[in-house]
């Protein structure tokens, strides 16, 4: 596959959705999952600050292992008002989250940080996509929770999977909801010289 890399890129995430999005964008990269304790980050802080801090922490933790590469850390959360919804731990929590999201609008925040140890350059961007669910019946909520899809996803749903039927409207970046705002990421990587669309002669 044709790639757009000029320099080595590391993805500090084990998310299969981020892996797929970056591959589709033509980025050649390696994966090194960040080993951090997310519970130490205060969930009471504003959603944008919370997700930016996590993306930066992940990027810096992995970047230390790759002095000559650009490292990308990312994190996605769902917020309803001032309440941050993480990944449901089980069926009951998934049902609770889906009930909260039913027939209302919520925000999906994804932040990414790009850094490298041998450079002073560090970019953090956060993108907010507004998503509205249709009114969900109890049967729909329980059926979807039983599919198992909600359990590794912020907010308890996957817009790119079975959970697409939950979504009535979306305003903003679709890939941001999946897990990585590709348009903004490409622009940031290009501004750092990590990628280029010019043909290499």
Feature locations, PLM:
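Anionic-ligand binding patches
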Residues: 3-10, 44-201
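N-terminal beta1-alpha1 ligand-phosphate binding loop
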Residues: 4-27
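Cofactor-binding loop segments of dinucleotide-utilizing enzymes, especially the Rossmann-like FAD-
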Residues: 14, 34, 117
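A short local structural element in Rossmann-fold oxidoreductases
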Residues: 23, 41, 142
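A local structural micro-motif
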Residues: 29-30, 197
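A short beta-strand-loop structural module common to alpha/beta enzyme folds
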Residues: 30-38
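Catalytic cores of phosphodiester-bond-cleaving enzymes
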Residues: 38-39, 48
């Amino acid at each position: 596959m044709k790639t757009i890399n000029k320099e080595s890129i590391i993805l500090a995430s084990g998310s299969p959705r981020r892996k797929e999005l970056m591959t589709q964008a033509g980025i050649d990269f390696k994966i090194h999952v960040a080993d951090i304790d997310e519970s130490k980050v205060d969930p009471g802080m504003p959603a944008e600050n919370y997700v930016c801090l996590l993306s930066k922490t992940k990027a810096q933790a992995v970047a230390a292992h790759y002095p000559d590469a650009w490292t990308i850390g990312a994190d996605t959360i769902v917020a309803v008002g001032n309440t941050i919804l993480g990944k449901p731990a089980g069926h009951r929590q998934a049902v609770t989250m889906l009930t909260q999201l039913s027939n209302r609008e919520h925000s999906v925040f994804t932040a990414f940080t790009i850094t490298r140890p041998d450079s002073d350059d560090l970019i953090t961007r956060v993108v907010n996509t507004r998503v509205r669910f249709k009114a969900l019946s109890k049967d729909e909520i329980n059926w979807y929770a039983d599919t198992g899809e909600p359990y590794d996803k912020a907010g308890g749903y996957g817009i790119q999977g079975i959970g697409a039927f939950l979504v009535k409207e979306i305003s903003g970046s679709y890939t941001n909801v999946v897990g990585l705002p590709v348009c903004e990421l490409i622009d940031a990587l290009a501004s750092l010289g990590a990628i280029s669309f010019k043909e290499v002669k």
